[in-house]
Design a protein with these regions (language model features):
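Soluble metallo-hydrolase cores and metallopeptidase-like ectodomains found primarily
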Residues: 25, 105-109, 114-138, 191-270, ...
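N-terminal signal peptide
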Residues: 10-22
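Alpha-helical metal-binding/catalytic segments enriched in His/Glu/Asp
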Residues: 75, 241, 257-315, 437
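N-terminal capping segment at the start of a domain
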Residues: 20-60, 186-194, 262, 334, ...
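Extracellular/luminal Protease-associated
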Residues: 60, 109-200, 268, 378
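Metal-dependent peptidase/peptidase-like ectodomains
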Residues: 107, 265, 308-412
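His/Asp/Glu-rich mid-to-C-terminal helical/loop segments that flank catalytic regions of hydrolases
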Residues: 285, 410-450
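Noncatalytic luminal/extracellular "stalk/propeptide" segments of secretory-pathway proteins
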Residues: 31, 35, 47-145, 150-152
Length: 450
């Protein structure tokens, strides 16, 4: 119980409030997670989910079994309103034994992962290597396989290469090989969604995209064969998971923290987004536990957590939930998600990517200042990439995505690869993410107004 004594000694701190934020409450919550009874509980919670069920591809039994398992655990935890809501007509794509082979100037089976959603197709053609996206407008790609060998500038900047199928198909291209979206590789191609299911398309490992680039620069003729056996199947129904801590005064106003439970069909889906799930669960568990002995932690508004399905397929699960609830009696007061690595922030390059008005941003800044006082370095940065909660953000609901400093590059070493395993996380990563999400939920569920 040393942590309790330490907290009592700190009650004399001159920094009990930071604007509208009660720093003593933030300190109590964050220390309970980082140094108290909740330490490492999120990581421990995550282990059976990813080890026992593995990756959780949409429309697969592993996902639906993991949903059932998670719901039962949440009920045992005593949360309010634990239930699932169906998300029908979800895209159902099955990866096959796909191959891409360099035929000229030598024979080499290339290391690829088919881009999600692509239908079966075979094509053999000459390839043209482009180092920049804009070159599609000045290069003859008609009848050719387009190979992109771009330099890494960032995921959101480079995602256009993986999604180029529709545009290059309109120019006559017959196939797409996109350099994987990441700054580092050990022969590890990345998967992800594309833009046209009818054009054979795959992601190349960084090493082999650069190999093809070197061959092209030496004026070698490249001939490549693509054989896609993956296929689209009839749509399925999946489920979002919802659980609450009911508000004591304004239960119809909802503060949302969220992550997604589905993953691609590779690795364990621990990084993307099992860690986010664990952090959200840990934040909710801590607020509930503290509220049982300290009335300050009984939220006035309802704190809701959602584990989304079908995030990897265009946020389809979240979009369906939004459509079902947008005209309901509940009012979403604040929305958030963590889906870019549940890592410990080490510098103020770690951000809360924020959408909202000037007044709301100022209040978010006060929350950040309180986190900093509790040794959690972070800053607020405006940004319109809000993932699963984008629909609410577009409606004007203030929103946040947590992105740790390691989320900009290190996260993409493993993102959408076979290397997405639990051992990526280090001690404290999920705890710190939970402390951030828990602070947001606690403070905003109790403030008077924006």
């Amino acid at each position: 119980m040393d942590w309790i004594l330490h907290l009592i000694l700190l009650l004399g701190s001159p920094y009990l409030t930071v604007g509208f934020v009660n720093n003593d409450e933030v300190q109590t919550l964050t220390r309970y997670i980082l140094r108290g009874p909740s330490r490492n509980s999120g990581l421990e919670w995550l282990e059976p989910l990813v080890d026992d069920f593995g990756h959780r591809m949409l429309c697969r039994k592993s996902l639906e079994d993991a949903i059932d398992f998670t719901v039962e655990r949440l009920r045992q935890d005593g949360f309010d309103n634990v239930h699932t809501e169906e998300a029908p007509n979800m895209p159902n794509w099955e990866r096959g034994e796909d191959t891409v082979t360099l035929l000229e100037p030598r024979n080499l089976k290339l290391n690829i992962l088919t881009i999600g959603g692509v239908d079966p197709a075979k094509v053999t053609a000459e390839a043209v290597v482009l180092e920049d996206y804009d070159l599609i407008n000045t290069t003859n790609v008609n009848g050719k396989i387009v190979v992109f060998n771009q330099k890494w500038t960032g995921y959101y900047e480079d995602i256009k290469y993986r999604r180029a199928a529709k545009e290059i198909k309109a120019l006559g291209a017959v196939g797409l090989l996109a350099k994987s979206l990441g700054p580092f590789s050990i022969g590890s191609p990345h998967t992800g969604g594309g833009s046209d299911e009818h054009l054979p398309a795959a992601s190349l490992s960084l090493e082999e995209a650069e190999l093809l680039g070197r061959l092209a620069r030496r004026n070698k003729t490249l001939k490549i064969s693509i054989d896609i056996r993956s296929k689209n199947l009839p749509p399925c129904t999946s489920r979002n998971i919802i659980f609450d801590i009911k508000g004591s005064e304004k239960p119809e106003e909802v503060v949302l923290i969220s992550a997604h439970i589905d993953s691609w069909d590779l690795g364990q889906g621990a990084l993307d987004d099992g860690g986010g799930m664990a952090a959200v669960w840990q934040a909710m568990k801590v607020i509930r536990e503290l509220g049982q002995t300290d009335k300050r932690f009984l939220p006035k508004r309802t704190i809701r957590a959602i584990f989304w399905t079908a995030e990897e397929h265009g946020f389809a699960g979240a979009k369906h939930y939004y459509e079902q609830h947008k005209n309901g009696k509940e009012k979403f007061y604040f929305v958030s998600e963590t889906d870019q690595g549940a890592f410990k922030p080490t510098t103020t390059k770690s951000i809360l990517r924020f959408m909202g008005n000037t007044t709301q941003r100022a209040k978010m800044q006060e929350i950040v200042q309180s986190l900093k006082r509790n040794d959690i370095p972070i800053s607020v940065q405006e940004g319109d990439k809000q993932g699963d909660v984008q629909s609410w953000a577009d409606d004007g609901v203030p929103s946040v995505q947590y992105v740790a400093d390691k989320g900009a590059d290190f996260y993409f070493y493993f993102h959408h690869t076979t290397g997405d395993y639990l051992n990526i996380f280090e001690d404290g990563d999920i705890d710190y993410t939970a402390a951030i999400m828990g602070t947001l939920a606690h403070v905003l569920s109790n403030q008077d107004k924006w």
